[in-house]
From Swiss-Prot:
Protein name: tRNA dimethylallyltransferase 2
Alphabetized Gene3D superfamilies for the sequence: 1.10.20.140, P-loop containing nucleotide triphosphate hydrolases
Family: Belongs to the IPP transferase family.
Cofactor needs: Mg(2+)
Species: Parabacteroides distasonis (strain ATCC 8503 / DSM 20701 / CIP 104284 / JCM 5825 / NCTC 11152)
Pfam family, one: IPPT
Keyword Transferase attached: yes
Catalytic activity: adenosine(37) in tRNA + dimethylallyl diphosphate = N(6)-dimethylallyladenosine(37) in tRNA + diphosphate
HAMAP family noted in UniProt: IPP_trans
Length: 299
């Protein structure tokens, strides 16, 4: 049976180098499951694989979208499942790596068939969010779908807005489209989680932010600043520097905020991943143990 090896873990843990070693060991390409590496022109802030790394191993789902393109976990599921059906014709084991929790779950479990939202409805809601804030949109969700209102992370404006988009477009509660039925995949899924001691991970995150700044993150963010309203740029590393460009923060404060928000995101990732009993955890330096585990799983 064909296999999909998923190397996952928090930001900054060291997934990239290990994924290259695993891919080379099993003769596999790498599929990125990082929701921001999909976009062009953001290689530094998204820690995208370098040209040298992409020369070592063929990569997919990296630098394929414009900043203005709308893309969701549902799109990712469709694209990656289709890609795997082609790759598995000649490559029995394929590696996927990244830390975008929803994207990984989309490939492993599938996403319910939610209607596609029209640009007019999406634009209207984001305009309302920009002018009025999230409170009236939350109130609309509570009225239209009290079940999902109780379940959704009400601080996550993207999820709140998406639910209201569906309610407006269909006239039905967003929750009515959710079945929570796991889809069957025609391949074995092997999940390997990477984690480090908390202090070690925090130090790596801080050092990585400093390295990104030395490699030109400030200039990369400045080029993206005219597009700051786009969802593709509502991400750690850019939104903080946008506050510096607007005069709201000093550069030192913006950099400290990037480090802090990256650490917070890493904790959120681990909270999500720790709920999954299918993940076998390793320290990234335990390469031989990881290879042994994978060799036993891939038959």
């Amino acid at each position: 049976m064909n296999s999909l090896v998923i190397l996952l873990g928090p930001t900054g843990v060291g997934k990239t180098e290990l994924s290259l070693q695993v891919a080379e060991r099993f003769g596999s390409p790498i599929i990125s499951s990082d929701s921001r590496q999909l976009y062009k022109d953001l290689p530094i802030g998204t820690a995208a694989p370098t040209p040298e790394q992409m020369a070592r191993v063929k990569h997919y789902m990296v630098g394929t979208l414009s900043l203005t393109d709308y893309y969701s976990a549902s799109n990712f599921e469709e694209d990656v499942v289709s890609l795997l059906s082609e790759l598995h014709k000649t490559i029995p084991t394929v590696v996927m790596t990244g830390g975008s929790m929803m994207y990984i779950d989309a490939v492993c479990k599938g996403i319910d068939d939610i209607p596609t939202v029209t640009p007019e409805i999406r634009d209207a809601l984001y305009m309302q969010f920009e002018t009025e804030g999230l409170a009236p949109i939350l109130a609309e969700l509570k009225e239209a779908d009290p079940v999902h209102y109780e379940e959704v992370d009400r601080n996550n404006y993207k999820r709140v807005i998406h639910a209201v988009e569906i309610c407006r477009m269909t006239g039905k509660p967003y929750s009515s489209f959710r079945t929570n039925i796991k889809k069957e995949r025609p391949f074995r899924i092997i999940k390997v989680g990477l984690n480090r001691d908390r202090d070690e991970l925090c130090d790596r995150i801080n050092q990585r932010v400093d390295q990104m700044m030395s490699e030109g993150l400030l200039e990369e963010a400045r080029r993206a600043y005219p597009f700051r309203h786009l969802n593709s740029l509502n991400t750690v590393g850019y939104k903080e520097l946008f506050n510096y460009f607007s005069g709201e923060w000093t550069l030192d404060l913006a950099v400290e905020k990037i480090k802090r928000n990256s650490r917070v995101y890493a904790r959120k990732q681990m909270t999500w991943f720790k709920r999954d009993p299918e993940i076998t955890w390793f320290h990234p330096d335990e390469t031989e143990a990881i290879f042994t585990h994978l060799s036993q799983q891939i038959i």
